[in-house]
From Swiss-Prot:
InterPro entries attached to this UniProt entry: TUG-UBL1 (IPR021569), Ubiquitin-like_domsf (IPR029071), UBX_dom (IPR001012)
Segments forming domain UBX: 273-350
Provenance organism: Saccharomyces cerevisiae (strain ATCC 204508 / S288c)
Summary of the function given for this chain in its UniProt record: Involved in CDC48-dependent protein degradation through the ubiquitin/proteasome pathway.
Name of the featured protein: UBX domain-containing protein 4
Length: 416
């Protein structure tokens, strides 16, 4: 923190200042330290035989740290002399009043004129229940009114900005209503078709049936899609960088041990993602799947009732189990999100005591069923959902690329 030294009659006074504080505060502290029972307007701080502005923040004064300032009477300097300006009109200073909810207002006013009437005019219907902010200071309007303060008393000697802070909520609502009459026109945002798009929510309690593929697993593994699907996105890079920084500490900081990492992780608030729907996929013994969307506040009793509606035998006794860790879920009033802590997508296992190994789902639902591998191939990624796909679904087998027989660019040898 910068240090300022004030000299007066061979005495020294050292004071610490912040970057946003003004030398007007230093002047008041110096007068109190040297026990000068006069007004602060009669004194000024001198540096290199010139008065220093008292209304500018420290970071704008361009003064070195530990600068030596001299406390002197303002009568010794005609610029700050108040008694010698009786025949000279006071300076007119431009002040910009910033009012929340309205445009800024610029007014010219003498530096010796009380600012309470002008502030009352600017505040409108707020009355006396507001404050003003000058640089880093916040002053009540009642104090300005009672002490009859002027711009000189506030340390303002040059064009400055004054912010009005209202405490009354009704006045702020009135301002927002006035601003709503003349809304600001914002230019329309341009959207890129290749930007990330959010998938629409699923229809609640509507089933989607998926059947296992007839192709061997070896054939499915050899079917490699386009290499663009494996490119690292910006979100994935940020997530990976955050994981590395949490393990090794931030750049330039100390390396955190395992205990400190666990302690910092426990101190962080849990940021629960806003889940709008719980997508449950039930796997049957014949490897068929049925996918149903539920609300997060629905219970397991509703899940059991909805799943039983799509069975051939609706009165069949069955049990839904959590896949990992394996846990039977009872038909009770436990909420999906609050009690069972289900995510946006959850897999459940269907278990029954019936000896039937055939299809358990109704026939009209099986007619519209999709292959599981077909779903994973044709479903576009979120980042490329708006990209055009000129090829139809029928020639998926021909569009699949095999990169095992291709030579990468970095492995090609030069012909020289």
């Amino acid at each position: 923190m910068p240090m300022v030294t004030v000299k007066y009659n061979f005495q020294l006074f050292k004071c610490k200042v912040s970057l946003n504080s003004t030398l007007n505060d230093v002047l008041h502290q110096s007068i109190q330290f040297f026990q000068l029972h006069t007004s602060s307007n009669d004194w000024s701080l001198i540096h290199l035989d010139k008065p220093v502005p008292l209304d500018l923040p420290w970071r704008l004064l361009n003064l070195p740290t530990g600068v030596n300032l001299e406390l002197s009477k303002s009568s010794n300097f005609p610029v700050a002399n108040k008694t010698n300006r009786e025949d000279i009109p006071f300076n007119t200073i431009k002040i910009r009043f910033q009012i929340p909810g309205r445009d800024s207002v610029v007014k010219e006013m003498p530096s010796d004129q009380p600012i309470a009437p002008i502030l009352r005019q600017m505040s409108g219907a707020a009355g006396d229940d507001f404050k003003i902010q000058v640089f880093s200071k916040i002053i009540e309007f009642k104090t300005i009114k009672d002490e009859n303060l002027t711009l000189e008393n506030l340390g303002i000697q040059e064009p400055s900005s004054v912010r009005l802070i209202f405490n009354n909520t009704s006045h702020s609502e009135g301002i927002s209503a006035n601003s709503a009459i003349h809304p600001k026109q914002t230019p329309p945002t341009m959207t890129n078709p290749e930007t990330v798009a959010s998938l629409p929510p699923h229809e609640l309690h509507k089933p989607s049936v998926f059947l296992p593929s007839d192709e061997p697993l070896a054939v499915i593994k050899d079917q490699i899609e386009d290499e663009e699907d494996y490119e690292l996105t910006v979100e994935q890079a940020k997530k990976y960088q955050k994981m590395l920084s949490s393990k090794a500490g931030t750049l330039g900081g100390p390396i955190l041990t395992k205990r400190l990492r666990e302690q910092s992780a426990n101190n962080l608030p849990k940021k629960n993602k806003a889940i709008s729907e719980c997508l449950l996929r039930v796997k049957f013994p014949d490897r068929s799947h049925i996918q149903i969307a539920f609300k997060p506040n629905e219970d397991m009793r509703t899940v059991y009732n909805v799943v039983s509606q799509f069975l051939i035998d609706e009165n069949m006794p069955f049990t839904l189990n959590q896949s990992h860790p394996f846990k039977p879920l009872a038909k009770d009033d436990k909420k999906l999100l609050d009690d069972l802590e289900f995510g946006s997508k959850t897999m459940l296992l269907f278990e029954t005591n019936s000896n039937s190994n055939g299809p358990l789902i109704k026939a009209h639902l099986l007619e519209d069923a999709q292959k599981i591998t077909h779903e994973t191939r044709t479903t576009p990624s979120v980042n490329t959902i708006n990209k055009s796909n000129p090829q139809g679904p029928s020639d998926n087998a021909t569009s699949i690329k095999k990169t095992l027989n291709r030579v990468p660019k970095w492995m090609k040898l030069s012909k020289k």
